[in-house]
């Protein structure tokens, strides 16, 4: 939508079509707060109706094939469509398919996928919330795969918000929380020391440099052979671009781009990639996705001879939820930032958890949604 809005603002003489799997958009940054019931779906879901009113053509369907040599995209119609297979021709193709959660490399994943919960989709987060609000005792395992993955702080946010819920219910002493991380430290690294200190105070066990390679009915196994029992498994699978990207020769794990500022594919001037699926040397989060979309739109405007440009640079301030040590359902957050306009990138942080940062994150997300979709 950021690309579409920018192209319309630039008054480009073209039909702008958005192909989306769902007739609604589910915002990501505050999804973890669904666990504590501080957030509700109605505040973070938006439809495309106002975009259509502005002149964007919205096609609800799932893209499954790209033919870059002949400028064709094939898709199967979705919820608000005939449900048939369709084909779109393009002059420019901007790929923003997001990521797929690929557990295919984990033994037992297909058999025990029903045990895998996380905060990344409505069904799984709802079931995870149900379990942590009803269970009386047990072991909760939280897992983060190798970076990069979507929303770097989400696994630590998950662990700390679960901790808050259990404290609120008065049953924290009956649970063990274990965070297994495939990286050498929790993500993002800029606040890893802060998270480690909070984990220590809250009694959350942290295991780093351990990839989960096998899932059983009540146990996970790491690459080194360590076994961890679980009653609840809050696990994020490894992230990658959808398979049709590789099949089209546009990349393997991620979509190939020329540079962060020039998001065209190395082989095709008319194919650009933005968001989490783009092969960028940055964290995968909503702000970087938005900024990459503006760079891509600017490149199309440049190629079309338009003088309009959206103001953009790769830099952001973010907030990571760290729960509430007193068990109140009023989550605190720590603030961090990364400025990629300097090399090496300049990090910043305030290690002191504050309620105001949680409110700032909410205000930012609501403003983002209003600007993107045209209504609050």
Region locations from a protein language model:
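C-terminal auxiliary extensions adjacent to catalytic cores
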Residues: 328-376
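Active-site substrate-recognition segment that forms the wall
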Residues: 147-171, 256, 264-273, 291-299, ...
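Beta1-alpha1 glycine-rich phosphate/pyrophosphate-binding loop at the start
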Residues: 1-57, 146-189
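FAD-binding core/adjacent interface of flavoenzyme oxidoreductases
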Residues: 57-157, 164-170, 234
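A Rossmann-like FAD-binding core segment of flavoenzymes
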Residues: 13, 54-80, 88, 164-258
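FAD-site-proximal beta/loop scaffold in flavoenzymes
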Residues: 111-136, 227-292, 302
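Residues that mark the start of a beta-strand
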Residues: 15, 139-141, 176, 270
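A conserved FAD-binding loop/helix module that cradles the flavin
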Residues: 277-324, 329-331
């Amino acid at each position: 939508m950021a690309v579409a809005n920018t192209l319309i603002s630039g008054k480009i003489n073209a039909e702008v079509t958005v192909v989306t799997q769902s007739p609604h958009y589910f915002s990501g940054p505050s999804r973890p707060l669904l666990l504590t019931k501080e957030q509700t779906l109605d505040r973070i879901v938006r439809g495309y109706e106002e975009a259509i009113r502005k002149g964007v053509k919205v096609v609800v369907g799932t893209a499954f094939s790209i033919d870059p040599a002949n400028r064709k995209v094939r898709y199967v119609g979705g919820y608000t469509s005939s449900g048939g297979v369709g084909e779109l021709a393009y002059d420019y193709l901007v790929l923003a398919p997001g990521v797929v959660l690929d557990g295919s490399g984990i033994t037992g994943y297909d058999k025990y996928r029903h045990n895998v919960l996380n905060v990344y989709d409505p069904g799984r987060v709802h079931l995870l919330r149900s379990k942590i609000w009803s269970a009386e005792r047990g072991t909760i395992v939280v897992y983060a795969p190798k970076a990069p993955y979507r929303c770097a702080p989400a696994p630590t946010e998950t662990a700390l918000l679960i901790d808050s819920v259990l404290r609120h219910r008065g049953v924290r002493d009956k649970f063990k929380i274990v965070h297994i991380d495939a990286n050498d430290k929790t993500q993002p690294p800029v606040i890893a020391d802060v998270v480690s200190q909070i984990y220590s105070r809250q009694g959350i066990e942290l295991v780093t440099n351990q990839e989960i390679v096998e899932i059983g009915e009540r146990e996970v196994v790491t690459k080194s052979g360590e076994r961890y029992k679980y009653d609840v498994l809050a696990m994020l699978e490894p992230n990658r671009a959808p398979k049709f990207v590789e099949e089209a020769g546009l990349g393997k794990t991620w979509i190939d781009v020329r540079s962060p500022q020039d998001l065209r594919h190395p082989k095709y001037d008319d194919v650009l990639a933005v968001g989490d699926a783009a092969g960028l040397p940055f964290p995968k989060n909503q702000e970087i996705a938005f900024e990459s979309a503006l760079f891509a739109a600017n490149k199309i405007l440049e190629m079309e001879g338009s003088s309009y440009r959206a103001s953009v640079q790769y830099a952001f301030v973010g907030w990571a939820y760290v729960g509430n040590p007193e068990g109140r359902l009023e989550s605190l957050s720590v603030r961090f930032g990364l400025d990629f306009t300097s090399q090496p990138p300049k990090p910043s942080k305030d290690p002191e958890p504050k309620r105001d940062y949680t409110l700032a994150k909410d205000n930012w997300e609501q403003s983002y949604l209003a600007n993107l979709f045209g209504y609050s």
